[in-house]
Amino acid sequence: KYGSSKIPAKDTSFIKNNFDGEVQKGGRSEALRIIESFLKIRVQSYLFNLSAPGKSEKFCSRISSHLTWGTISMKELLKLVEDRKVNLSAEEAKSWKRNLTAFTSRLSWRCHFIQKIEDKPSIEYKCMHSFYESLRENVFNKDYFIAWKEGRTGYPFVDACMRSLNYNGWITFRMRAMIVSFASYDLWLDWRKTGYHLAQTFTDYEPGIHYSQLQMQSGVT
């Protein structure tokens, strides 16, 4: 993990074979560099740009892949955030503290969903609400699925997000929710198949977060 030059390595068997994009750098030193950059500079615009697909790549923390691959721990990260709060100047505290608190709440949210799959691992392959089993899987359209994966649905915003994700291995949370809900409701694709593809694509794939959100955005909870 610590010696990796990319997150994850392009030859990782779990990653789709035709990956040809450019993912963020990995490694311990890179994890420390980007969190320092976030806490000292970028966090001041965190909430304002959190959901913007064009700006989130810069203003989000971008630490999620490092948490996934273990180049920084949650305990260490929380300590760095709390230290930053304590050392804010009076001027910084006016706006920065709110952004830091929002970031901390999302770290707590991450832990919550990881615990959720620990308590109920079946959510990886079973609908949380059993009534919705067989809702979509029996009418799966392979052509729709391929077009969605490749960013060729004909819906410009959806396709742009998918192509960006395929290239970078990362996209902001709101856009993840959008591409999943589009696949589930507009294309009527089963969440298990779209979810597996996304799990192969996200460099910060974390099963607990992934499957809980996938099911909620597909309306099977």
Where are the regions a protein language model picked out?
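Contiguous, well-ordered alpha-helical segments that form the cores/surfaces of helical PPI scaffolds
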Residues: 61-64, 102, 143-146, 156-166, ...
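Short acidic alpha-helical/loop segments enriched in Asp/Glu that coordinate divalent cations
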Residues: 118-130, 190-198, 210-213
